[in-house]
């Protein structure tokens, strides 16, 4: 290991060992209670300063602003009442709910052969997570998926939790200005003003939404993915053969949840994948997804042709028993689709897709993922692992967008969706990729048509190929658009896309970009309450409440840093201008003065008198305004609260 890599690992180890609660500025963790004592739904509440509405500097008239509640994915990492210890893991939030259903059993040990081998290897003791939980599995003849419960008409605690979470406490806002919202264009999405537990249950039962919630990941806070809910964002982390360590990946996990990652995928392809994943799961408040194929390939020393169902089956069980909430499975890539990619500019760019394509050609038969798909569903049903049906033939360049190969695979994914639903296994569909703006909607339309309204989950799409280093932007454009059209979850892209493994700062930039895209999509759809935060920030901006502007933003730290680069003094936090326009050309400051001016009845009466005089002498009004300006000291701008009409 190089000295720089060793130092990065040591720094990460130090960081996770000394993790302390780091709340957002002027925010606090609150909990909204449900129907039972153990349903406590976290929100982040942002406190706001009062609005100045009149008076003088010495005796101002103030009106309080209600705090704003926002969706929170950070778990206990922002709860000051919790002592963080990554060696003990997170509280098992859902453990009691799972026990109460009495349809699971505790296993005496791990079922996977590979897991048994890892546990018996003493050389891994230093790496291994020490507080391993007891494994659960469905009792014989039982199905433990949220889809199964929903179809039985059962509203689970998870569903109630989600209903509270999706509403974000917006019912309490009475302020007409905050509640103002433009009508959206939902493209057929059903967006009720209030999300109820029954609505959640019905959406899951119909297959339009999933609750990724493995019974072996009770630490995860329940969330939902579906086009009739808030658009979600996934963050990818994971080591490679040349970069990163367990400590760095745990650090990136915590970092991802802080900046709004609704789910996290561990895409590790390097050493110690099993141990890395255990550390991540035990410390993750959000659902964790994987691509099991990556680890299966490592087990056969990276030779795709040597993969087989036995290795894959053992890997699925291994990961399900650890607690992985959803698997990406590239089962829709069929042998006959591979030649369709021959004339592509960029061929097959999906790692999982290329592995399967190579295996299919080497054996000249359909992949074991396709031929054993029903067995995959049986495994998932025992642990409530959701399936994310992977798009192994997604376009890797805009030249290849919406081609025959891509849509042929999509239709097969729709067929597999119906098979998974036979086993009450939850399903989402993965999508592209690289697609120019004018071709994006066709992807959403085709997915809804062929995949029976199962939730769509896309990587971007990237709308142009000319910006390596800025692909978080090229893809953020496409993500906002497809989110508006109905995509349920967006997989983030970082500035390092196509260039290298992202570091912490890249993860943050990718997440902020995609939270922005998701929010823009929610606004465009007309999701109820989506505009409240925008309205609160705009009001703060107009009133020059700088701290509130920072704190209401997606990234308060960067917003404050940018402001302070040019106005670092504390006086800059109360100034009625910023460095963009300066004190004399601030449009909002001038607008405030105009508003105050218009409010003054004496001034209105005076102007009316001037207007009458102007009928007799058009220059009289000009002369009077000139006199007013000189009498006020010939100053172009005055503080809005001090402005007094000059009497002639």
From Swiss-Prot:
<comment type="similarity">
    <text>Belongs to the ThiC family.</text>
</comment>
<feature type="binding site">
    <location>
        <position position="578"/>
    </location>
    <ligand>
        <name>[4Fe-4S] cluster</name>
    </ligand>
</feature>
<comment type="function">
    <text>Catalyzes the synthesis of the hydroxymethylpyrimidine phosphate (HMP-P) moiety of thiamine from aminoimidazole ribotide (AIR) in a radical S-adenosyl-L-methionine (SAM)-dependent reaction.</text>
</comment>
<dbReference type="GO" id="GO:0016830">
    <property type="term" value="F:carbon-carbon lyase activity"/>
</dbReference>
<dbReference type="GO" id="GO:0005829">
    <property type="term" value="C:cytosol"/>
</dbReference>
<feature type="binding site">
    <location>
        <position position="430"/>
    </location>
    <ligand>
        <name>substrate</name>
    </ligand>
</feature>
<feature type="binding site">
    <location>
        <position position="294"/>
    </location>
    <ligand>
        <name>substrate</name>
    </ligand>
</feature>
<dbReference type="InterPro" id="IPR002817">
    <property type="entry name" value="ThiC/BzaA/B"/>
</dbReference>
<comment type="subunit">
    <text>Homodimer.</text>
</comment>
<dbReference type="Pfam" id="PF01964">
    <property type="entry name" value="ThiC_Rad_SAM"/>
</dbReference>
<keyword id="KW-0862">Zinc</keyword>
<keyword id="KW-0479">Metal-binding</keyword>
<dbReference type="GO" id="GO:0009228">
    <property type="term" value="P:thiamine biosynthetic process"/>
</dbReference>
<keyword id="KW-0411">Iron-sulfur</keyword>
<keyword id="KW-0949">S-adenosyl-L-methionine</keyword>
<comment type="pathway">
    <text>Cofactor biosynthesis; thiamine diphosphate biosynthesis.</text>
</comment>
<feature type="binding site">
    <location>
        <position position="457"/>
    </location>
    <ligand>
        <name>substrate</name>
    </ligand>
</feature>
<dbReference type="InterPro" id="IPR037509">
    <property type="entry name" value="ThiC"/>
</dbReference>
<dbReference type="Pfam" id="PF13667">
    <property type="entry name" value="ThiC-associated"/>
</dbReference>
<dbReference type="GO" id="GO:0009229">
    <property type="term" value="P:thiamine diphosphate biosynthetic process"/>
</dbReference>
<feature type="binding site">
    <location>
        <begin position="391"/>
        <end position="394"/>
    </location>
    <ligand>
        <name>substrate</name>
    </ligand>
</feature>
<keyword id="KW-0004">4Fe-4S</keyword>
<keyword id="KW-0456">Lyase</keyword>
<feature type="binding site">
    <location>
        <position position="586"/>
    </location>
    <ligand>
        <name>[4Fe-4S] cluster</name>
    </ligand>
</feature>
<protein>
    <recommendedName>
        <fullName>Phosphomethylpyrimidine synthase</fullName>
        <ecNumber>4.1.99.17</ecNumber>
    </recommendedName>
</protein>
<feature type="binding site">
    <location>
        <begin position="350"/>
        <end position="352"/>
    </location>
    <ligand>
        <name>substrate</name>
    </ligand>
</feature>
<keyword id="KW-0408">Iron</keyword>
<dbReference type="InterPro" id="IPR038521">
    <property type="entry name" value="ThiC/Bza_core_dom"/>
</dbReference>
<feature type="binding site">
    <location>
        <position position="581"/>
    </location>
    <ligand>
        <name>[4Fe-4S] cluster</name>
    </ligand>
</feature>
<dbReference type="GO" id="GO:0008270">
    <property type="term" value="F:zinc ion binding"/>
</dbReference>
<feature type="binding site">
    <location>
        <position position="434"/>
    </location>
    <ligand>
        <name>Zn(2+)</name>
    </ligand>
</feature>
<feature type="binding site">
    <location>
        <position position="330"/>
    </location>
    <ligand>
        <name>substrate</name>
    </ligand>
</feature>
<feature type="binding site">
    <location>
        <position position="236"/>
    </location>
    <ligand>
        <name>substrate</name>
    </ligand>
</feature>
<keyword id="KW-0784">Thiamine biosynthesis</keyword>
<dbReference type="InterPro" id="IPR025747">
    <property type="entry name" value="ThiC-associated_dom"/>
</dbReference>
<feature type="binding site">
    <location>
        <position position="265"/>
    </location>
    <ligand>
        <name>substrate</name>
    </ligand>
</feature>
<dbReference type="GO" id="GO:0051539">
    <property type="term" value="F:4 iron, 4 sulfur cluster binding"/>
</dbReference>
<feature type="binding site">
    <location>
        <position position="498"/>
    </location>
    <ligand>
        <name>Zn(2+)</name>
    </ligand>
</feature>
